[in-house]
């Protein structure tokens, strides 16, 4: 991460106000000020990292737990029928704030916004080789 604090770090530190919905030692969550739908929240690690793969295992684990807890509460409180969890890494992926963050976007029967993408058929030979390389890279 750069030396300059992200807007999210500044929110965590209380420099900017927000509508907080959750906080623990590792995670901070608040309502998005430009929501896609009612109940749209951002879930961020307190650890400053630009990309998901740069987070510590502990922050990653705590984010996973928080996403589940917050999603459940959003569904119960808003009456949403479904939700999207979106996380972008890098500008080509649509990331505009370079501090890891997840969007939980509630969906309602009248919701029209979709994150559906055009798909392609996978080449089985290429897929086999790629899967082996990714697997080896994890070990």
Language-model segments: what does each one mean?
Residues 1-139:
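HIT superfamily nucleotide-processing domains
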